[in-house]
């Protein structure tokens, strides 16, 4: 194998060779090609970045808010100019098709755009008269050094709802990107620096357990934002909180889609295919379970099977490909094991994605399991792959009861034209993000990404006004100004 480039950490505005004695291959999941190697950095390197970030915070937090916003606007413009390059990097190291990658880049740009509104977002409140000659004002201040732990499945969108907002509000930031998708972050760092961000304000340390524990334990770091699996999210929340940090942990999901008898059949099938199998099912807003009313079930499922069997599978850089690979071979094997567990427990496999006919890469085709029940492993666990479970129900009330049994409560969708049914769904379903006649109800940057139950640990969600509250603390000033001597 030819020499493979070893990535460096980004600390204090410089690319710094890691002191790690271990590197991991970064693999194109569609081909198996080794793209580069990423360091599994040491705790000492994270601690070094924390000291640098703390020093940078002292100056950056004093920069006028409009000036900070201009850096974010410049960053946004550079992202727009490099949109295609960024999308291709995502497809290369993550595997999702190029159209989906372009969509992710656009969502990342929108996150930066929202953060660039810092002058408005930072505004406090005031009351001119709370008592005789007494007024009060509420001011926002940045919390300090913030740590972020990002996943592989959205290597641009998720980090871009973390560090741009935190930095725009006056904080400094240390990011641990996924070691599976580091190349995109390398490009983002380059563009953020070009936009005029001072050295030390944004730092990137690649790694695994030691870096995560450093973020959670280092006293310099005041807040931690995490996106990833439920077990790791629980650990992050408990450990970070025990060390007196603010923590938001966005974790697993098992999103249910309800299809009622009056649903538009063609539109619903199109949306469910996209929601279940887009991004290879590796997203926390994927449709994992469909509960379909008996009156439309046969017709809907026949159309769904046909559509799933016609999905084009392959390298996301190739024209017309809809479904790319899962991220690694171990994910592929894990997914196949879940499918076989479903069969053992009595589910009916009506579309089998275990064999795709592709000789290289880590592919699982669209898979549909019917006759699923809520005691089955495939219904309970987050599979994080292009596997869809189907449950037939008698009515909306039963569909909601099924969904609400899940420990997860990230998103849920309904397909119907019945306003009463929509209202019932909205009021009774346990989930933080709801979709009506659409398959992926991920909100825009100015609304919170608001999972419930085991899908989220913390108080303040990512994005929206919650993110402003998360990355700032408040100072209320009460002042007396006597008007004595100015009487008319």
Swiss-Prot record:
It is an enzyme of class 1 (oxidoreductase). GO terms for molecular function: malonate-semialdehyde dehydrogenase (acetylating) activity; methylmalonate-semialdehyde dehydrogenase (acylating, NAD) activity. The keyword Oxidoreductase applies. Pathway: Polyol metabolism; myo-inositol degradation into acetyl-CoA; acetyl-CoA from myo-inositol: step 7/7. InterPro entries: Ald_DH/histidinol_DH, Ald_DH_C, Ald_DH_CS_CYS, Ald_DH_N, Aldehyde_DH_dom, MeMal-semiAld_DH, MSDH_GmP_bac. Transmembrane segments: none annotated. NAD(+) binds at residues 150, 152, 176, 179-180, 229, 251, 382. One of its GO terms (biological process) is thymine catabolic process. It catalyses: 3-oxopropanoate + NAD(+) + CoA + H2O = hydrogencarbonate + acetyl-CoA + NADH + H(+); 2-methyl-3-oxopropanoate + NAD(+) + CoA + H2O = propanoyl-CoA + hydrogencarbonate + NADH + H(+). The keyword Methyltransferase does not apply. Its EC number is 1.2.1.27. Keywords: NAD, Oxidoreductase. The active site is at residue 284. Homotetramer. Belongs to the aldehyde dehydrogenase family. IolA subfamily. Catalyzes the oxidation of malonate semialdehyde (MSA) and methylmalonate semialdehyde (MMSA) into acetyl-CoA and propanoyl-CoA, respectively. Is involved in a myo-inositol catabolic pathway. Bicarbonate, and not CO2, is the end-product of the enzymatic reaction. This is Malonate-semialdehyde dehydrogenase. The gene is iolA.
